[in-house]
Amino acid sequence: MASKKAGGSTKNGRDSQSKRLGVKRFGGEKVLPGTIIVRQRGTKFHLGNNVKMGRDYTIYSVVEGLVKFERFSKERFKVSVYPKAV
């Protein structure tokens, strides 16, 4: 017969893994085509020039250039990539 009392179970101890969302390339940074600029859930940032959106709302560059975040209403931003002037 066991002489050790059974330990109680806990209802805590679960958490989801972080999804590493957020801005990956900031304003003024140089990017290449295909570079991820923002990972997000929903459209926290909207599309500007020379960027596209993936099916998970990831915004990425389609040209080589510099990233620019532009405010287009009181609390909304759009992300653009402008080619460097030659």
From Swiss-Prot:
GO terms for biological process: translation. Residues 1-26 are annotated as: Disordered. InterPro entries: Ribosomal_bL27 (IPR001684), Ribosomal_bL27_CS (IPR018261). Keywords: Ribonucleoprotein, Ribosomal protein. GO terms for molecular function: structural constituent of ribosome. GO terms for cellular component: ribonucleoprotein complex; ribosome. Belongs to the bacterial ribosomal protein bL27 family. NCBIfam families: L27. This is Large ribosomal subunit protein bL27.
